[in-house]
Amino acid sequence: TLSHSSAASDVYKRQMPHNSNGSNGQMFEVETFRGDPISIEYAEKRMRNEPVVEVTQVKGTSDTHPLLSPDDEWADFEIMDKRVGSRPPTYSMPQGGYVRDAYLRGLTLEWEGRGNPYKFGLIGSSDTHTGAGAFDENNYWSKVGVLDGIDMSRGSVPLTQDRIDLLNQYADLYDQPVSVQEIDGRTYADVGFDQWSASGLAVAWAEENTRDSIFQAFKRKETFATTGTRMAVRFFAGYDLSLIHI
């Protein structure tokens, strides 16, 4: 495991659950992939390896979903309801895929004596593959460059005939059909990019601007996420927190 590897090599390694909203409910299950019940050992291992979780990024928000939080008027904020990488785009089941629901699942597992594998801190991330992040909806340039770098590729405006011909050439080359949709007599790319958004940022309360100090902040879960706004927020919460700690 990562924890054993870290102990042996004295190298800091951590995993950060990514795009849980597109996991079809598999990210925060109440049993293992083998169908075994979650155990205290599993919960402890997951918390050692995964102290924080990504709650927002370009492929949607992983906070909550209208089906999970029907009384929350913001529950539909930047929802991507498709499974990551599915072709054609396929619905992703929300139960087990969103962080707020994972918190409740973790508390239930802990109450049952099986430990809490979902006691996460929060981060955001851009998930861009361009070496830069686009955090302003009014100045969004792309996530992966060649695939969504122009408005036609994202399905924001109709495809021109030249673009359709180019896509068909790629389809023939890679033996993969081009996914398009007809709206009011116009042809649009149907790639699921219309549910992407300009987001997000990870914020860490670190003692200094060094990699080690930032990683230690992740380990302490002294982090929060924004959808792109650069703000400084600090708050304190904990099971055993007292005034002397503050």
Annotated model-derived regions:
Residues 2-8, 12, 244-245:
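Single conserved hydrophobic/aromatic residue that forms the stacking wall/gate
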